[in-house]
Amino acid sequence: MQSKLLLSTKLTSQGKTQLDQYFVSPPFKVMTLPAYDDAWQNGLNAMQMSSSPGLLASDLFDIEISLADDTALSLNTQAFTRVQSMNEGDYATQKTCIKLGKNSRLFYLPHPLVLHKDSSFKQTTEIEMSEQSELIYGEIVAIGRVLNGERFAFRHFASYLRISYQNRPIIADRIQWLPAKMALTSLSQMEDFSHQGSLTYVNLAKNAVEIKAMVSELQALAAEQKNMLIGVSQLNEGGLMVRVLAHRADIIQHLFERIGQVLKAQSNIV
């Protein structure tokens, strides 16, 4: 099955963000949500939904998101994405392409990805920033259905994230897991944890001193958390990354939502 989700935003004459172009093929659907108290005033809140029980062999999910100048979008998902069991040599794929217009802001936090036994999954995410644009993007992955006794029972997981500005890379993050060939429970890998999360923040309007202060604030927040291993690193330019290991998906999800609110509150864009 090949599925497509295409959405873009526009700015109304009242200065509010609305959906502009919108196209989905099954199992995708997008629902706009009521506005809530948020530091990004006049932004759009939306939920990405899916009626699929999960990705099967040869499935391709193609997601394209484009934000117009001066718009703000907070996009969440409805439920976990599950990669189902498949024959050896088969795999499912997801491709995500995001373009941010000048002065636009995006918060995108999909629900965790769950890798079932004998599954293989490849995903690529490419994000193009523009002048004064701001990005908060999170990914969470589970090593299997742990409560069913599945730990690293999948065959292959590959994830590539590339964020660029004017065709110049700001960050490239690649994850490659082959449980049959890699000691993924060793020190400096997953150890005894079952869930990994990554949250990337990019705001090229912030200087190194401002980003460093934000890193310090998030490190203090991380120190308060229990049953998680958290690292916060400053990027070479205009941003930071948070990496988390935990035993449950929901605590990473809640932490990233809280961090998102902290970062939104320090937005330089009114």
From Swiss-Prot:
One of its GO terms (cellular component) is cytoplasm. InterPro entries: UreD. The keyword Chaperone applies. Its main location: cytoplasm. The keyword Transmembrane does not apply. It is found in: Cytoplasm. One of its GO terms (molecular function) is nickel cation binding. UreD, UreF and UreG form a complex that acts as a GTP-hydrolysis-dependent molecular chaperone, activating the urease apoprotein by helping to assemble the nickel containing metallocenter of UreC. The UreE protein probably delivers the nickel. Required for maturation of urease via the functional incorporation of the urease nickel metallocenter. Belongs to the UreD family. This is Urease accessory protein UreD. The gene is ureD.
